[in-house]
Amino acid sequence: MPTIACNIIEVCVFSFENKEPLYLMLRRSLTEPLYPNTWQIVTGSIETGETALQAALRELKEETGYSPKKLWIVPLVNTFFSVRHDTVNHTVIFAAQIDSAVPVQLSDEHYQFGWYTVEQAKEKCVWPGQKKALDIVHEYIVGGKEAASLSEITV
């Protein structure tokens, strides 16, 4: 019987350029054993003893060098099945607004990045769950709907 796990986080990172929202996409290194050369939002594992929020802040810093100006919990949990581990994974998703004046500092896990409109970012995504996360962040959080004020996290 498959196990159920919740040990992965994702962070949709955005900033504003001339009042237009742009989303950060990262391209995994060619040497990464899992999904090399694919584009993704910030993604990482929750370490033992760490909360999902702590993992999101750590992964954001490790993968991009950023600390968020604002942070939200996204009203979506991605779910996927790993055949290799016989596990149903639930992924907690966050959104982070960053200061666009600060340059990206990529970790060795990625070799390329770009800032894209929501449609361009979704075109780069491999996984449907990340496309859906970008849609929700764009509509509800960046769009300033009530869900944004209800899901903002003080950092």
What are these regions (language model features)?
Residues 1-24:
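Conserved N-terminal beta-strand and adjoining loop/helix that marks the start
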Residues 3-6, 18, 33-34, 86-89, ...:
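A generic fold-level signal
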Residues 7, 65-102:
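Active-site segment of metal-dependent pyrophosphate-handling enzymes
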Residues 13-15, 25-27, 93-97, 115-117:
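Short, well-ordered beta-strand micro-motif
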Residues 20-62:
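Conserved Nudix-box catalytic region and its N-terminal flanking loop in Nudix hydrolases
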Residues 40, 88, 115:
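Short aromatic/basic micro-patch
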Residues 93, 105-137:
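NUDIX/MutT-family hydrolases
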Residues 129-155:
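Charged phosphate-binding loop/patch that engages nucleotide di/tri-phosphates or the phosphate backbone
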